């Protein structure tokens, strides 16, 4: 599995935030793989807030908590050249009950995942 990120801001973040985002991506990939082992494709995953919390166009929100940090990751899952790809379009560190990230994520509704992939940055590989 390869992790790509669409936003350049990732590289300006503190190392602990970068590590948390990568850890969240690996956790998400493990959950998706668990479904695939049960012959349930990503497009058929419904009613599981731990994988697809909210939908924004062709992207989904993944909620992840590490220590006191609450992450919201806007992602899509692709298979390119027989490789699993998690494409992170955006992310937010959520503070208290602030839901401003929803409007930020909604702004990406019209983004085509393949076009975003072509302009994304490779950040990690995980199995």
Show where each model-derived region lies.
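Arg/Lys-rich, positively charged N-terminal/basic patches that mediate binding to nucleic acids
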Residues: 1-34, 115-127
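A short, surface-exposed loop/turn module that caps and links secondary-structure elements
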Residues: 34-65
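Intrinsic disorder/low-complexity signal
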Residues: 12, 47-48, 53, 83, ...
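Intrinsically disordered, low-complexity regions
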Residues: 8, 25, 29, 37-43, ...
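Generic cytosolic/nucleocytoplasmic N-terminal low-complexity/intrinsically disordered segments
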Residues: 1, 54, 93-94
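Alpha-helix capping and helix-coil boundary motifs
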Residues: 14, 36-43, 90-91, 112
């Amino acid at each position: 599995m390869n992790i790509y990120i669409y936003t350049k801001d990732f590289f300006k973040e503190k190392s602990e935030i970068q590590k948390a985002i990568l850890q969240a991506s690996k956790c998400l990939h493990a959950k998706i793989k668990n479904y695939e082992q049960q012959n349930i494709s990503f497009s058929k995953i419904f009613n599981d807030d731990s994988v697809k919390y909210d939908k924004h166009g062709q992207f989904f929100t993944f909620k992840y908590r590490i220590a006191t940090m609450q992450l919201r990751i806007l992602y899509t899952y692709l298979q390119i050249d027989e490789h699993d790809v998690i494409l992170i379009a955006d992310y937010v560190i959520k503070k208290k009950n602030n839901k401003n990230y929803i409007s930020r994520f909604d702004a990406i509704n019209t983004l085509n995942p393949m076009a975003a992939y072509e302009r994304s940055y490779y950040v990690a590989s995980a199995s």
